[in-house]
């Protein structure tokens, strides 16, 4: 299904529209991306359910609504270069790569990164740079970034990510431990504004690398 929407994917996109996702580019990207490719075969039948699913190593592929919502927020300033923290399965990266000119993505778990790279190559997505490393540190020599998305919950907003955000740039990040808030942070020169978008539930953003 490379670029061709299946009935299940179209139904998912339709349900996301009804749930409040209005960006047509985001909806099309989700409809055109085979979510089952990013899951273990045993979970393939759940690919188009609006739910988070396990991908191994204690990580998950996010609920499609959250993928779409975070992508909408990130696109508000029409970013050219985007940083994703937490490649995971590669599903969110696939959506972003269809919508922005340049995507840089960081993953701390080597086995997940290897699998994600293979999947994204099979989808013929070539505007992605990959880094194996600590997401808390971002990717300084690729910055500054017009937008940054974090796909795991940080206890606090990592200072390195604020530093790597361009002026007028947007950072979309879940913050908190037990109770987590999805924040949209905007840089204004040397200051930052933030707003709470909604309550969310993510795996934690962990320091360091894991082979």
From Swiss-Prot:
GO terms for molecular function: protein-L-isoaspartate (D-aspartate) O-methyltransferase activity. PROSITE patterns: PCMT (PS01279). Its EC number is 2.1.1.77. It comes from the Bacteria. It holds the Pfam family PCMT. GO terms for cellular component: cytoplasm. Keywords: Cytoplasm, Methyltransferase, S-adenosyl-L-methionine, Transferase. The keyword Methyltransferase applies. It catalyses: [protein]-L-isoaspartate + S-adenosyl-L-methionine = [protein]-L-isoaspartate alpha-methyl ester + S-adenosyl-L-homocysteine. The active site is at 62. Its main location: cytoplasm. The keyword Transferase applies. GO terms for biological process: methylation; protein modification process; protein repair. It is found in: Cytoplasm. Belongs to the methyltransferase superfamily. L-isoaspartyl/D-aspartyl protein methyltransferase family. Catalyzes the methyl esterification of L-isoaspartyl residues in peptides and proteins that result from spontaneous decomposition of normal L-aspartyl and L-asparaginyl residues. It plays a role in the repair and/or degradation of damaged proteins. This is Protein-L-isoaspartate O-methyltransferase 1. It comes from Shewanella sediminis (strain HAW-EB3).
């Amino acid at each position: 299904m490379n670029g061709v929407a299946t009935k299940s994917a179209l139904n998912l996109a339709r349900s996301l529209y009804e749930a409040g996702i209005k960006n047509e580019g985001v909806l099309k990207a989700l409809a055109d991306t085979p979510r089952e490719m990013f899951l273990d075969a045993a979970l393939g039948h759940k690919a188009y359910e609006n739910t988070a699913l396990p991908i191994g190593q204690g990580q998950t592929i996010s609920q499609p609504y959250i993928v779409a919502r975070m992508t909408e927020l990130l696109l508000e300033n029409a970013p050219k270069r985007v940083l994703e923290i937490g490649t995971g399965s590669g599903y969110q990266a696939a959506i972003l790569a269809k919508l922005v000119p340049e995507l840089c993505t960081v993953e701390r778990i080597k086995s997940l990164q290897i699998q994600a790279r293979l999947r994204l190559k099979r989808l013929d997505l070539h505007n992605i740079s990959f880094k194996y490393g600590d997401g808390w540190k971002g990717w300084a020599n690729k910055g500054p970034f017009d937008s940054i998305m974090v796909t795991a919950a940080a206890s606090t907003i990592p200072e390195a990510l604020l530093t790597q955000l361009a002026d007028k740039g947007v950072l979309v990040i879940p913050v908190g431990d037990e109770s987590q808030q999805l924040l949209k942070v905007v840089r204004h020169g040397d200051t930052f504004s933030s707003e709470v978008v909604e309550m969310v539930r993510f795996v934690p953003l962990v320091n360091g690398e894991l082979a």
